[in-house]
């Protein structure tokens, strides 16, 4: 299967074209640019340099959150646009599973992705690498960093942009190498290979936020006061 995967749920933006488990092309950028300006050009540059086209992809896999509200929306919209033009199906992949899949070679390791959810909280989950793939132990959720010690049954390896902040709350935990704890479309592609049967038509692709955006929460708070 040929998979075009997109990751824009956090600071970096990356794209990967994978075929039958092999990465044929990839591009990554983390220079603070708005994903709306970078994600599609990254795709087009990668495909052009590799002699590929959007039509070559059987599946469009995208990081559907949790993470940056804007980044997730941009990724979903980009995936839908590509799929609409090619007829390919889409797959929403948890950004936390994507992080864990970066570490699929660390057999037996307990993995705890921690992505900044603001206000001293993180988006998190738990995975154990078994037979070369992270098996989910806990669903994606929001927790205060202070609650992570109770959440983890044993010291885990930490991933994600809040991994360093979480380290102080988890005695015995350790950071994954930077290249493995950073959001990358390689992890999205790896996860997509395992869950390709769950692919849907592009109009059914939806983001996963886990909480309201700051703007939405502010509006709701104002409505309650009125």
What are the functions of these language-model segments?
Residues 22, 28, 34, 89-183, ...:
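Surface "functional belts" at beta-alpha junctions
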Residues 13, 34, 65-69, 73, ...:
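Gly/Ser/Thr-rich beta-alpha loop segments that engage phosphate groups in nucleotides
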Residues 1-64:
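N-terminal beta-alpha supersecondary unit
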Residues 48-55, 84-93, 105, 109, ...:
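Phosphate-handling active-site elements
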Residues 19-23, 76-86, 129-131:
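A glycine- and small-aliphatic-rich helix-loop capping segment at beta-alpha/alpha-beta transitions
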